[in-house]
Design a protein with these regions (language model features):
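Zn2+-dependent metallopeptidase catalytic domains
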Residues: 1-292
Length: 292
């Protein structure tokens, strides 16, 4: 497996290495043109994105734990690169020096939004503040990975005691879930079980049972497969919220909701909360019908 891990790591980091190589080409270029700066910057983003996409996918779906762990390490390296890039003053200055006044609307928009995102990230803050922001982003990446890992590895099971209750499910699904020695059919919260079961099973009670099990993953409470139960995700979530609040405060926002929505159509945390309240009022009557 060591050889497979190394091969995957090399493949996963190929895009990142290309992105890292493009950085000096951009900031050291004497020609501050759209092609030399924005074009290469776009190539840099695409290269890093390729590594990030591969790492994110394989960390969740690869059957080998060693490869999943290698993918998470790759993801951390890409995230570290993104964090440094977002606070890279030399890159910001190179991008800001490009004259896009005669460019098409799409190029002007890309340029304006890129500079805006740099300022939102804190590129104009003192060096020590930027260093703290980078540290926060790195910690948030690790915490988010831990949060996702806890959920993905917390596989729950429901038991079906009568094959007739599998009515509605495709024949191949039923055939792949024979009864065990005790006569019970076991359905897990893994996606190959969960998605078809929730889509096709006629038995409302079983679908409710599986849905609750699926949504309870990572809560740290004992369950059928919970021989070794940790504290779940509560502590991790608290750490994430604490760091998000610190980052928002450093960047001049009252809270994380205001920061994360500032560049969105909704515009602020208060507006987002108002929207959710309106949706809740409209949806509540129909939702209540499901309970009666």
């Amino acid at each position: 497996m060591k050889q497979a891990e190394q091969k995957f790591r090399t493949e996963c980091l190929a895009g990142l290495r290309r992105a890292q190589a493009l950085r000096p080409e951009i900031i050291e270029s004497s020609a501050r043109t759209i092609e030399e700066v924005l074009g290469r910057y776009n190539q840099l983003l695409m290269a890093a994105s390729a590594s990030n996409a591969l790492a994110g996918l394989m960390s969740e779906v690869h059957p080998a734990e060693a490869i999943r762990d290698a993918a998470r390490e790759c993801e951390q390296e890409v995230s570290k690169f993104y964090s440094a890039l977002a606070l890279d003053r030399e890159m910001y200055d190179a991008l800001a020096a490009v004259d896009v006044s005669a460019a098409d609307a799409d190029t002007q928009r890309f340029h304006a939004h890129t500079l805006r995102d740099y300022r939102r990230a804190g590129v104009d803050r003192p060096l020590e503040v930027r260093a703290r922001l980078e540290n926060i982003d790195e910690e948030l990446t690790k915490l988010s990975q831990a949060f996702s890992k806890t959920i993905s590895e917390d596989v729950r099971v429901i038991e079906v005691d009568d094959p007739a209750r599998l009515a509605g499910l495709p024949a191949d699904f039923i055939a792949s879930h024979p009864a065990a020695a005790d006569g019970k059919i076991r359905i897990t919260t893994d996606y190959p079980d969960y998605n078809p079961f929730m889509t096709y099973a006629n038995d409302d009670a079983l679908r409710e049972q599986l849905y609750i099990a699926f949504r309870s993953r990572g809560d740290g409470k004992p369950h059928e497969r919970g021989a070794e139960v940790d504290q779940g995700n509560e502590a991790v979530l608290r750490d994430i919220l604490t760091l998000r609040a610190e980052k928002a405060g450093i960047l001049g926002y009252a809270n994380w909701a205001d920061y994360i929505t500032a560049d969105k159509m909704i515009g602020s945390g208060d507006r987002a909360a108002e929207f959710l309240e309106r949706v809740q009022k409209l949806a509540a009557p129909r939702a209540q019908e499901d309970y009666t």
